[in-house]
Amino acid sequence: MAMSERTTGTRDEHYDVISVLYHALQGADTCGTYLQDAEQAGDQELAQFFREVQGTYRQLGDRSKTLLRQRLR
């Protein structure tokens, strides 16, 4: 049995990339909400932190899309 099959119940590596993409996009969206909360509270340090985290999630999402696109050709 392949390692990914034991971990996720499927041998499809595309599922794993799609899952990372989903969670990255969800994280970026959630950080957007937290960013708005911090800005409304006037906490610029926290707002900057959420901007950075959101940017990281977006980078992960972009990388996931690239990897998935390459594998679906």
PLM region descriptions:
Residues 2-73:
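Amphipathic alpha-helical hairpins
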